[in-house]
Design a protein with these regions (language model features):
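Conserved, helical-rich catalytic subdomain that frames metal- and/or nucleotide-binding sites
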Residues: 167-171
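Mechanochemical coupling/switch segment within NTP-driven translocation systems
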Residues: 160-163
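Extracytoplasmic thiol/disulfide redox context detector
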Residues: 17-158, 172-175, 179-205, 221-233
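Positively charged n-region of N-terminal signal peptides that target proteins for export
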Residues: 1-5
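Short strand-coil-strand connectors
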Residues: 55, 211-212
Length: 233
């Protein structure tokens, strides 16, 4: 026991010091930038920098808050973008918390892989992503209509949602430009779509989420397919 006490003491002392340093940096940032509210401070493992998160913004500073750096930090040895990796983790969600009953569901093959995509009916990049994903089998795609691009986007989203076959209406319109067949009027959950997107920070379309909660911005099908596969492992 006597041999373990010093190690435990040192670990506790190190943790306390780290927490004290992070608290000091937090106070320093908030003092330097009057009115700013820091969400988190984390000591990084590189260059004695501290990671600062304010809302959706991530930047770095030194212990004394004399310098601030906003941009990407690249590990020259591995060529990894450390900032991008960290932002991916910070922007992750719990996939199981998504209200999938508000999404258009399409199952291909056994549907064992899954992805959720926020899409505007008039988004050209959404159409490009939808077309690229046609080549994927054994996948379930949950499409949340997110009508934010045009004034007519909400009406088009309503028409698609109220169609007799939502998935067919959506893909016919996105891939072939076919107008959705007129269906009976229904209460399309436009307000719920918009509230959901705002809640999880969806700012543009397409925005996709894998089952492990990772967020992918834009039409990047190759990267998305890779991440979808990794999420299922």
């Amino acid at each position: 026991m006597s041999l373990r006490l010093p190690a435990l003491f040192l670990a506790a002392a190190f943790t306390a010091t780290a927490l004290a340093d992070e608290a000091s940096v937090r106070r320093g940032v908030e003092a330097r930038f009057d009115g700013i509210k820091v969400d988190s401070v984390t000591k990084t493992s590189y260059a004695d920098l501290y990671e600062i998160v304010v809302g959706e913004t991530l930047f770095y500073t030194d212990e004394k808050v004399n310098f601030v750096f906003k941009g990407d930090i690249i590990d020259a040895r591995s060529q990894k973008n450390l900032t991008e990796e960290r932002q991916q983790k910070l922007s992750a969600i719990k996939f199981e918390d998504l209200p999938l009953d508000l999404a258009i569901k399409q199952v291909r093959g056994n549907g064992k892989r899954a992805v959720a995509i926020f899409s505007d009916p008039f988004c050209p990049y959404c159409k490009s992503l939808d077309r690229a994903l046609l080549r994927q089998d054994d996948i379930t795609i949950y499409t949340f209509l997110y009508p934010i691009l045009r004034a007519e986007s909400p009406d088009k989203a309503r028409t698609i949602w109220c169609a007799p076959d939502r998935a067919k209406a959506y893909y016919d319109f996105m891939l072939n430009g076919r107008e959705p067949a007129a269906g009976p009027s229904c209460n399309a959950p436009v307000d719920k779509w918009l509230a959901l997107g705002k809640k999880i920070g969806v700012r543009a379309t397409p925005t996709s989420f894998t089952t492990n909660g990772e967020r992918i911005l834009g039409a990047r099908p190759e990267e998305l397919v890779k991440l979808i596969g990794e999420a299922q492992k």
